[in-house]
Regions:
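Active-site neighborhood of phospho(di)ester-bond hydrolases with catalytic His/Asp-centered motifs
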Residues: 56-59, 80-87, 107-110, 171-174, ...
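Short hydrophobic alpha-helical segments enriched in small aliphatic residues
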Residues: 3-10, 17, 21
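Structured catalytic core of nucleotide-sugar glycosyltransferases
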Residues: 34-44, 86-91, 95, 106, ...
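Cap/insert and terminal regions of metallo-dependent hydrolase folds
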Residues: 181-281
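Conserved beta-strand hairpin/beta-sheet module of binuclear metal-dependent hydrolase folds
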Residues: 9-15, 26-72, 157-175, 192
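Active-site metal-binding motif and surrounding structural segment of the metallo-beta-lactamase
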Residues: 62-109
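Metallo-beta-lactamase
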Residues: 110-160, 164-167
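Active-site environment of divalent metal-dependent phosphoester hydrolases
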Residues: 41, 88-92, 114-115, 156, ...
Length: 295
């Protein structure tokens, strides 16, 4: 009897083990994303894994960055790079400290690096931490494949970032005056999209800003309005897109509920239901978002 059972187990082992017919679950990489701050007074985003991560922009104070990361159990020693989109103060405030004091490589185009070191808000000028990248050329940082691409904005030079890992595609477009064909390509590739919805058109029109500033914001190299972002998404949303985070909201000309509602209504008009077909979040200016984890 015992011999018979042993024989049966041996046959099963041989068939399933040696002939490799056991179905094994593919190991997937957990990708984490959080917005530490998103708005016209400061921007900083984390994307990474349990072991390491990178920052996209560093436009808030170094102490604030350290505190938010510590609250998440993330040490600065696990940050492999800082990617800078452009040289405006709300994107580079802490980059000198991160690069030169903590030795974290800072990636951007040569023109942006020149702009960073000319900026009044960067007291620690970059030298040993400088890493150049070219738009359209992919670089690799750990398991993250990163491509910078051109976006229209009025900084020295301006890029968005496409970050791919384990089949997951994140596209960051934080400041842009309009959506070009290149920007549209990276938006439509994304599973996870961080896209600007800076201002409500009526709030900007009726607000206290001087006329030249209103024209700059609404111009082709300024910022995206809620309506413009909503219309593009409604006409171009793909089935692969799972999450949309509306970013870089203006303090004076927008608020999260209005941005969310504008996009949600236009998506619904095209038969796309938020919460079912896609997730939609309007990021807050000075408060970290929840930590999102994707496998």
């Amino acid at each position: 009897m015992h011999f018979h059972l042993f024989y049966v187990y041996l046959r099963l082992f041989w068939r399933n083990g040696c002939n490799n017919t056991i179905t094994r679950k593919r190991n997937t990489m957990k990708i984490k994303f959080i917005s530490l701050a998103s708005g016209s007074s400061g921007n900083c985003y984390f994307i990474g894994t349990d072991a390491y991560g990178i920052l996209v922009d560093a436009g808030i104070g170094i102490r604030t960055i350290k505190k938010h990361l510590k609250d998440l159990g993330i040490g600065l020693d696990t940050i492999r790079a800082v990617l800078i989109t452009h040289d405006h103060a709300d994107h580079i405030k802490a980059v000198g400290h991160l690069g030169e004091k903590f030795g974290i490589p800072v990636y951007s185009t040569p023109e942006v690096h020149i702009g960073i070191n000319k900026s009044y808000c960067v007291t620690e000028k970059l030298s040993t931490s400088v890493r150049y990248l070219n738009k359209g050329t992919q670089i690799q940082i750990e398991d993250l494949s990163i491509t910078a691409f051109e976006v229209p904005h009025d900084g020295t030079d301006n890029v968005g970032y496409c970050i791919e890992a384990d089949g997951k595609i994140f596209s960051f477009l934080t400041d842009l005056g309009h959506i070009t064909s290149t920007a549209a390509e990276y938006i439509c590739r994304a599973n996870y999209l961080i896209l600007e919805a800076n201002y409500d058109e009526e709030m900007l029109k009726m607000g206290p800003y001087p006329q030249y500033l209103k024209e700059r914001i609404a111009g082709p190299n300024g910022h995206m309005s809620n309506r413009e972002t909503a219309e593009f998404l409604a006409e171009n949303i793909t089935e692969r897109l799972k999450y949309i985070w509306l970013c870089h909201l203006s303090k004076d000309n927008n608020h999260p509920e209005l941005a969310y509602k504008t996009v949600e209504l236009l998506l619904r008009s095209k038969g796309v239901l938020v919460g079912k077909d896609v997730q939609l979040i309007a990021l807050k200016r000075n408060t970290p978002s929840e930590l999102y984890e994707f496998e």
